[in-house]
């Protein structure tokens, strides 16, 4: 690959629409790393004569980061969508064997090749919107062989597509049917057999747990966190989605990368997250899809300075969403975030939620040249439009990996 000077662009280098350069340039080394960013009038002499790529006045942002997804699974759950429309709650469906457990059955029955093919169809729309890094969780296998297949497929997606994939082991997602009434025994299996085996195979970047009334208790969640700590793995938590169970405070005690959902988060949990540097990952797609009514405590998070990230939470039961731009719109319209908060939420703060702030979410010398090109007049349009393709080009490691004739 040759070195390139990208020019005639408007630059939002760090995901903050209030910190931009109107006439900017980006020098990218032949190895795909950024050599320099700044005003076009200040291009250092060493880069002036490099081959140029004219972006015709478009905006450039860091590649987007989807920091919470369940992208790999078998089947779909449109039938449960119809049940919810008829009045059934998420908890009611789960308690009678639907919900997560129905996807577990479909995932266990699917081959690795079938899981890969289905996941590809879900990933492509995200990549076309400028996503260059994504987190993918397991958690629909709930036994070693199926969890392994899910994580292997996630790794394969990162090898086959121009996207950095971060894998999260979510064995403690739900209680599998064969362990009904024996949750502690299942946590034994997660901590003593599944996690060690998958970590030894290099399939796990982080560990998550669903701490909720219909999930796992604080004590069980802590056992999973302890098992992760023994392996030197960072942790995350699904917390306070359906009730205030104190999960966020536990996550903070283990210096979790993130606590996610958080509709029922209280002031004590917010303060704990601030003290531990834990990112709040908000998931407006799930909030919208299950018709939740309790909003996350946005003002408390702001007041305490807790970083807010946004993610699709793509999953078959509560957020079959494959658009991070629509997620931004929902974050603004439903959660009343500002455009600044929404864009930071899918760039810099989303990278922090993955423990990858040194690799993603910002454009600076020495980092990989992962960026998205937007032929819009203002960055507010990224959160304003929905159902309209906006991304003109995606660059990953200095190489154009997606283009759309948007003009």
From Swiss-Prot:
A Pfam family it matches: Amidohydro_1
Cofactor note (record): Binds 1 zinc or iron ion per subunit.
EC number: 3.5.2.7
Keywords in alphabetical order: Cytoplasm, Histidine metabolism, Hydrolase, Iron, Metal-binding, Zinc
Entries under Gene3D superfamilies matching the protein: Metal-dependent hydrolases (3.20.20.140), Urease, subunit C, domain 1 (2.30.40.10)
CDD domains in the cross-refs: Imidazolone-5PH
GO-annotated biological processes: L-histidine catabolic process to glutamate and formamide; L-histidine catabolic process to glutamate and formate
This protein's GO CC annotations: cytoplasm
Pathway listed: Amino-acid degradation; L-histidine degradation into L-glutamate; N-formimidoyl-L-glutamate from L-histidine: step 3/3
Family: Belongs to the metallo-dependent hydrolases superfamily. HutI family.
Record protein name field: Imidazolonepropionase
Organism: Burkholderia pseudomallei (strain 668)
Gene: hutI
């Amino acid at each position: 690959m040759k070195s390139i000077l990208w020019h005639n662009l408007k630059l939002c280098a760090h995901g903050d629409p209030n910190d931009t350069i109107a006439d900017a340039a980006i020098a990218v080394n032949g190895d795909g790393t950024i050599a320099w960013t700044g005003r076009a009038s200040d291009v250092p002499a060493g880069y002036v004569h490099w081959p140029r790529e004219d972006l015709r006045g478009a905006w450039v942002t860091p590649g987007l980061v989807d920091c919470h997804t369940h992208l790999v699974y078998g089947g779909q759950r449109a039938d449960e969508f119809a049940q919810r429309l008829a009045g059934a709650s998420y908890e009611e469906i789960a308690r009678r064997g639907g919900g997560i457990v129905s996807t577990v059955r479909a995932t266990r029955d699917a081959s690795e090749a079938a899981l890969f093919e289905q996941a590809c169809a879900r990933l492509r729309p995200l990549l076309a919107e400028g996503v260059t890094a994504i987190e993918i969780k397991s958690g629909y296998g709930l036994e070693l062989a199926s969890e392994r297949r899910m994580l292997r497929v996630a790794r394969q997606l990162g090898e086959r597509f121009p996207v950095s994939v971060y894998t999260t082991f979510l064995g403690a997602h739900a209680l599998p049917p064969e362990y009904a009434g024996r949750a502690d025994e299942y946590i034994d299996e997660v901590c003593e057999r599944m996690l060690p085996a998958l970590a030894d195979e290099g399939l796990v970047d982080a560990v998550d747990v669903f701490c909720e009334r219909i999930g796992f208790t604080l004590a069980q969640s802590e056992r999973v966190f302890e098992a992760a700590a023994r392996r030197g793995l960072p942790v995350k938590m699904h917390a306070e989605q359906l009730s205030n169970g104190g999960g966020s405070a536990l996550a903070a005690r283990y210096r979790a990368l993130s606590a996610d959902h958080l509709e029922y988060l209280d002031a004590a949990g917010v303060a704990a997250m601030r003290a531990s540097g834990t990112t709040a990952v908000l998931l407006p797609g799930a909030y919208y899809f299950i018709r939740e009514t309790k909003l996350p405590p946005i003002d408390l998070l702001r007041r305490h300075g807790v970083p807010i990230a946004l993610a699709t939470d793509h999953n078959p039961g509560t957020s079959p969403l494959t658009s991070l731009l629509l997620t931004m719109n929902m974050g603004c319209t439903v959660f009343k975030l500002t455009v600044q908060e929404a864009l930071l939420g899918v760039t810099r703060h989303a990278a922090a939620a993955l423990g990858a702030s040194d690799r993603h979410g910002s454009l600076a010398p020495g980092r990989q040249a992962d960026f998205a090109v937007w032929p819009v007049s203002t960055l507010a349009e990224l959160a304003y439009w929905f159902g309209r393709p906006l991304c003109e080009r995606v660059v990953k490691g200095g190489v154009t990996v997606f283009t759309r004739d948007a003009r």
